[in-house]
Amino acid sequence: MSDTLLNPYFGEFGGMYVPEILVPVLKQLEETFVAAQNDPLFQAEFTDLLKNYAGRPTALTLCRNLTKGSKTKLYLKREDLLHGGAHKTNQVLGQALLAKRMGKTRIIAETGAGQHGVATALACAMLDLPCVIYMGAKDVERQSPNVFRMRLMGAEVIPVQKGSCSLKDACCEAMRDWAANYETTHYLIGTAAGPHPFPTMVREFQKMIGEETKRQILEKENRLPDAVIAAVGGGSNAIGMFAGFIEEKSVQLIGVEPAGKGIETGEHGAPLKHGTTGIYFGMKSPIMQTKDGQIEESYSISAGLDFPSVGPQHAYLNASGRADYVSITDKEALDAFQALAQHEGIIPALESSHALAYALKLIAQNPDKEQLLVVNLSGRGDKDIFTVDKILNGGN
């Protein structure tokens, strides 16, 4: 793979492990991406859409009540305020513009929580591109508001009945579709994972999260935060936040994986800390797999974190020690979900609630420590209210 324009690896992780038929397609995508990055007209169109369609920059909000009794200042980067309800819209607009530039006439995508599906559907509606979304049947059931939104915007939503009927199965079906229809179709991957150039491309189309946060925190506090905290499934919201701070060695980068029902139960989605390196979804990265290499089922209350692998740059940041990765259980995430709603009037996505829960844990452990924390509130929780209601009122 020495003939790629960009390095396809992050340390030992990443690469382009795809059927031979897709290699030229990925190379075309990489060439188009590199050209677009250097094209002021492309950048101007992307920036204009982010500002006037998606609503950037998003706010950096100080929590006024959650930190009472402590010396911590906690800020939330409000990606929940972005059009579409989550950070997903950022990079979807970038990839959709690339697809048009390549002359593709059809977009496919996978989605777990439905947020990436919604973002893809809205971008395709606005740019007049047909759109097919693959979604695990289990997720179709638990994310019905987002399924309706996608269909309302003209997307075809295909429930995937195979395997565990979750995000990993939706990814496999989308990859199959792409291999069969690559000449006309762009596969708009929803996270910073998959074969090269997707992890690099998605990071570049999400990095404004960290860049804005850095500018905003310096403006408000006149210093950098002690830590930035983000939930990690595939890893796009976290890499978008981390990208602004990787070079700032004084800032701790904390990624939060889902511990589900508890790491010891095996029902979790924490491959970075509890998986082994393997090949999956076109990349080399940590995976939840059995000793004979079968992909294990991941689990999280949050559909968007229910993924058995993780983006290769996170694997590298973990291996190199630059970022720290921790895990939060369903229960801790639910408690944080309720706490933010009750004390700040903000309903976070269950994905983002994992990051918030870890911040609250840090505050509780060190109430007398003066610390400045930023949580990436990657999405809003409207999509999760039925799931949470069911659990709190005696459901699962």
Curated annotation (Swiss-Prot):
It comes from the Bacteria. Pathway: Amino-acid biosynthesis; L-tryptophan biosynthesis; L-tryptophan from chorismate: step 5/5. The modification N6-(pyridoxal phosphate)lysine is found at K88. GO terms for molecular function: tryptophan synthase activity. It catalyses: (1S,2R)-1-C-(indol-3-yl)glycerol 3-phosphate + L-serine = D-glyceraldehyde 3-phosphate + L-tryptophan + H2O. Its EC number is 4.2.1.20. Pfam families: PALP. GO terms for cellular component: cytoplasm. Its cofactor is pyridoxal 5'-phosphate. It is an enzyme of class 4 (lyase). PANTHER family: TRYPTOPHAN SYNTHASE, TRYPTOPHAN SYNTHASE-RELATED. The beta subunit is responsible for the synthesis of L-tryptophan from indole and L-serine. Belongs to the TrpB family. This is Tryptophan synthase beta chain. The lineage of its organism: Bacteria, Pseudomonadati, Pseudomonadota, Gammaproteobacteria, Pasteurellales.
